[in-house]
């Protein structure tokens, strides 16, 4: 029997107000590969999904704010997010244009940074912020 690949030691887990739309955006904008999706049979929400961009795996689900202290909320419900992604690419301009065409909001246009090479900053339709960088 083949050994199952271990999960990463640390992976971001996103809460989204519309996880299906977020999955579609990440596929179109960042060529994310969907590894798996579990639909909650009680409510039809995406209870867990796994995606991969390059060598990074990350998770997402629909928000569940109604579950009290165990609840998870989307950036839309919280009025923002406390962190952002750093995505390293070969062509910042092309990656930025592709993400904007897929529905991202451009927060900072592509610029040259002394410490980080070329970079831009985007907000995806789910409210998560991304820095797209060449370094």
List PLM regions with ranges.
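Vicinal oxygen chelate
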Residues: 1-15, 23-24, 30-125, 132-135
